[in-house]
C-alpha cells in the first residue's frame, strides 16, 4: 500500500528539493534534472500552497526568483496615481514655481527639498508588516505591471525592512536603474553575441525589469534609489525626515538631498550637480524640487497631470564632437525610411553613443553632411542622441556628400516621396519584411489587440513563414507553435489564449491596430465614434470624413486608400471570420441635449476632473469637441495654465471662457 504523505511534509520536501536544484543550477552551474522535471515540481508546490494557504511561507521558492519563464505580468491599479512632474529649464521658471507655491500657501513660509532626478524606471513598492508584497511599474500612472518577482532580485531593494518602527502598510516609490558599468558590460556581451545593443541605461533597465525570466534580471545587477514614502499611519513630519526614515529602514536614498530655505540655496545645489552628475555611477537627468511639509503639499494639491508642490529642473543637454562614419537606414511599419548616423563611439551623459538621429533627407541636405565629417552630438533630454552641427573646417577633401538612398534598405524597392511630405516611403507594403514585422508588432501592442507576444517571437514566427499579416495570428495552432525552439505546451497555450482574448478587444483598439497611416489612437477613437463598424467606415466618403473633428484631407485620403486595396479588404474579411470585434458593442447615446449644437474647446489643467472626463461630458451631453479656437467655438472650458495662443484668439473672436465650476453647474442643472 502506497504511503500517504501529509501535505505539510510534501510542501517542505518540495521546497528543500527545489532549493537544492536552484543551488546546483544557478550557483554551481551543474544541474542534475532537466527543466521539465523542475517545472513539474514547482507547479506541484504552487498547487499545494494554493490548496493549503496556511502552509505558505515568504521564503518559499515560489515567492522568490521564479522558474516560470513564460509568465506574463498582471496589470495592477495604483492606490494613488503615479503622476509625472512638470519640467523647467531655467531659473526664471524656478522663480515662477516659487511664486505659484507662495500664492497657493497664501504667503506662508515653506522649505524646498532638492534631490537628484534619476533617469530610470519608476517603481512602487508595497510593504505589509515590513515584508515586500508587491512591486508595480509606473505604467500609465493609473495602471502598472506587477513585476514583484523581478524586483526581488535587486539587492538594493529590501525584502524585509530593518528595525521595528515601520508602519504596518507602507508604499515606497523610487527608480530602478542600471549602473553605467553594468550597461557597458551587458552591451559588450550583446555585441559579442550578435544581439542588438541597448540605446541607453534607462531602456536597458526598463527592458530588464520586463523580462519574463527573473534569472536574467538577477544577472544584470540592477540598482534602485528611493525618494517617496506614503502610509495611512504616522510617518516623520516632513519629506526630508521621511527620506532619512526610509534610509534607516534599509532603503537606498541618495546622499544628494538638501533642505533649502531659499531660491539661492536651490540654485547652488543645481550648479553643484551640473558637473558632479557626470561622475555619478547611474544616470540622472535633472534635479527635483519638492515642498518639504506634507501638510503644505496637501494644500497645494495636484493638476490632472502633476503635483503643484514639485517640479523637475532639466539640465542643458551635453554636447560632444565625434566623427560621422556613414549613414544607414531603418524602415518603419508605415514604410517611412529614417536615416541613422553611425558615429565613432563617444561618451555622452555617462553612456557610449554610437548612433544618432538624422530625421529625414531634408535634414541631411540642410546640414550638408559628408562621410567622415566631424559633427556635434547632443542628447535631447539626456536620452535621444541627435546631430546639432557640423565642424566644416575639419572636413576632409576626400569626404563624399551623403545622398539619401533611393532604394528601400530592406527590400530594394524604389522609394517614393509624396508632395508636402518630409519622409521617403517604401511603397512595397505587402512585400517589405520590415514593414510586415512592424505592423505585426504594432497590432499586438497593449493599446491595440493586446496579444502577449514579444518581437523575438514575432521574428521567429515570421522566419518560419507562419505569419505575414495580422490575420495569420488567428490561424496559428498548438502543433505549429510546438515546433518552435523554446516553446512547450504551456507557452503555446498562453499565446493561443492571448490571441483568443484579443478577439474581444474594443473595435477602436482593433482599428488602431490595423496600422492605417496617420490613424493613431485618438483618431481611431474618433472614427469609431462616428462609424461604429468597420463596414460603415469603409463606405465613408472623403467629404464625410473631413467633417469629423481633427480629421483633415490627409487622414481622409489615407483611410480611403487603405480600404481601396484588395489585400486590406481580404484581411478584414479574415479577421471577421476569425471572430475579431469589428464593430462597437454599443452606440453612445447622449445623456442630455444641454450642449446640443455647441462646439467646445478644452484648454489648461483642472482640479475636479481630468480633461478626458470633461471631453466625455461634452460629448455625452450632445456637444462637439474641437481642438482649436474658431468663430464656430461656442465656449472654451478654461483651466489653469491655459494656452496663451488660445486665450489671445478667444479674446480676439469674443469667445466665452468658462471655468470648470461654471461648466459643472451648467451640466448639473
From Swiss-Prot:
Domain of life, source organism: Bacteria
Gene Ontology CC annotations of this record: cytosol
BRCT domain span: 590-669
Tagged with keyword Manganese: yes
Pfam families: BRCT, DNA_ligase_aden, DNA_ligase_OB, DNA_ligase_ZBD, HHH_2, HHH_5, Nlig-Ia
Reported function: DNA ligase that catalyzes the formation of phosphodiester linkages between 5'-phosphoryl and 3'-hydroxyl groups in double-stranded DNA using NAD as a coenzyme and as the energy source for the reaction. It is essential for DNA replication and repair of damaged DNA.
Homology family: Belongs to the NAD-dependent DNA ligase family. LigA subfamily.
Protein name: DNA ligase
Amino acid at each position: 500500500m502506497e504511503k500517504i504523505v501529509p501535505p505539510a511534509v510534501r510542501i517542505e520536501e518540495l521546497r528543500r528539493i527545489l532549493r537544492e536544484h536552484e543551488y546546483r543550477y544557478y550557483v554551481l552551474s551543474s544541474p542534475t534534472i532537466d527543466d521539465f522535471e523542475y517545472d513539474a515540481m514547482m507547479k506541484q508546490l504552487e498547487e499545494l500552497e494554493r490548496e493549503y494557504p496556511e502552509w505558505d511561507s515568504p521564503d518559499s521558492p515560489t515567492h522568490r526568483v521564479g522558474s516560470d519563464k513564460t509568465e506574463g505580468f498582471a496589470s495592477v491599479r495604483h492606490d494613488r496615481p503615479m503622476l509625472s512632474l512638470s519640467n523647467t529649464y531655467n531659473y526664471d521658471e524656478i522663480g515662477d514655481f516659487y511664486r505659484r507655491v507662495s500664492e497657493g500657501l497664501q504667503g506662508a513660509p515653506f522649505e524646498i527639498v532638492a534631490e537628484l532626478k534619476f533617469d530610470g524606471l519608476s517603481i512602487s513598492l508595497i510593504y505589509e508588516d515590513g515584508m515586500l508584497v508587491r512591486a508595480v511599474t509606473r505604467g500609465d500612472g493609473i495602471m502598472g505591471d506587477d513585476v514583484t518577482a523581478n524586483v526581488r532580485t535587486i539587492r538594493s531593494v529590501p525584502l524585509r525592512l530593518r528595525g521595528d518602527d515601520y508602519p504596518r502598510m507602507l508604499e515606497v516609490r523610487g527608480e530602478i536603474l542600471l549602473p553605467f558599468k553594468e550597461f557597458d558590460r551587458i552591451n559588450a556581451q550583446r555585441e559579442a553575441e550578435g544581439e542588438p545593443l541597448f540605446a541607453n541605461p534607462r531602456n536597458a533597465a526598463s527592458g530588464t525589469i520586463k523580462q519574463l525570466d527573473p534569472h536574467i534580471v538577477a544577472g544584470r545587477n540592477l540598482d534602485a534609489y528611493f525618494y517617496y514614502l506614503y502610509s495611512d499611519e504616522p510617518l516623520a513630519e516632513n519629506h526630508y525626515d521621511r527620506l532619512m526614515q526610509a534610509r534607516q529602514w534599509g532603503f537606498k536614498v541618495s546622499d544628494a538631498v538638501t533642505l533649502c530655505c531659499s531660491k539661492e540655496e536651490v540654485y547652488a545645489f543645481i550648479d553643484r550637480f551640473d558637473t558632479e552628475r557626470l561622475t555619478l555611477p547611474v544616470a540622472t537627468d535633472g534635479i527635483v524640487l519638492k515642498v518639504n511639509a506634507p501638510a503644505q503639499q496637501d494644500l497645494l494639491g495636484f493638476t490632472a497631470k502633476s503635483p503643484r508642490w514639485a517640479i523637475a529642473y532639466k539640465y542643458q543637454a551635453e554636447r560632444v564632437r565625434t566623427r560621422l562614419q556613414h549613414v544607414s537606414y531603418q524602415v518603419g511599419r508605415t514604410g517611412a525610411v529614417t536615416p541613422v548616423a553611425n558615429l565613432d563611439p563617444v561618451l555622452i551623459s555617462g553612456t557610449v553613443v554610437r548612433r544618432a538621429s538624422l530625421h529625414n533627407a531634408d535634414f541631411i541636405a540642410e546640414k550638408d553632411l559628408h562621410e567622415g565629417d566631424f559633427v556635434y552630438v547632443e542628447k535631447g533630454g539626456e536620452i535621444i542622441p541627435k546631430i546639432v552641427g557640423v565642424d566644416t573646417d575639419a572636413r576632409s577633401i576626400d569626404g563624399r556628400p551623403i545622398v539619401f538612398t533611393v532604394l528601400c534598405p530592406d527590400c530594394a524597392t524604389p522609394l517614393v516621396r509624396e508632395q508636402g511630405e518630409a519622409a521617403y516611403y517604401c511603397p512595397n507594403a505587402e512585400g517589405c519584411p520590415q514593414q510586415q514585422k512592424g505592423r505585426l508588432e504594432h497590432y499586438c501592442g497593449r493599446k491595440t489587440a493586446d496579444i502577449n507576444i514579444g518581437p523575438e517571437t514575432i521574428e521567429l514566427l515570421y522566419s518560419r513563414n507562419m505569419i505575414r499579416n495580422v490575420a495569420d495570428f488567428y490561424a496559428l495552432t498548438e502543433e505549429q507553435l510546438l515546433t518552435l525552439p523554446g516553446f512547450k505546451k504551456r507557452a503555446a497555450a498562453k499565446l493561443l489564449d492571448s490571441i483568443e482574448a484579443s478577439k474581444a478587444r474594443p473595435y477602436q483598439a482593433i482599428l488602431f491596430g490595423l496600422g492605417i497611416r496617420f490613424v493613431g489612437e485618438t483618431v481611431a477613437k474618433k472614427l469609431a465614434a462616428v462609424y461604429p463598424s468597420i463596414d460603415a467606415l469603409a463606405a465613408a466618403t472623403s467629404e464625410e470624413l473631413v467633417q469629423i473633428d481633427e480629421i483633415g484631407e490627409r487622414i481622409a485620403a489615407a483611410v480611403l486608400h487603405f480600404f481601396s486595396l484588395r489585400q486590406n479588404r481580404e484581411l478584414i474579411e479574415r479577421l471577421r471570420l476569425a471572430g475579431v470585434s469589428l464593430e462597437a458593442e454599443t452606440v453612445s447615446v447622449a445623456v442630455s441635449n444641454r450642449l446640443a449644437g455647441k462646439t467646445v474647446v478644452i484648454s489648461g489643467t483642472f482640479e475636479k476632473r481630468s480633461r478626458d472626463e470633461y471631453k466625455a461630458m461634452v460629448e455625452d451631453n450632445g456637444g462637439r469637441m474641437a481642438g482649436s479656437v474658431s468663430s464656430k467655438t461656442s465656449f472654451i472650458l478654461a483651466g489653469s495654465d491655459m494656452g496663451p495662443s488660445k486665450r489671445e484668439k478667444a479674446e480676439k473672436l469674443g469667445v466665452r471662457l468658462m471655468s470648470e465650476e461654471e461648466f459643472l453647474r451648467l451640466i448639473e442643472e
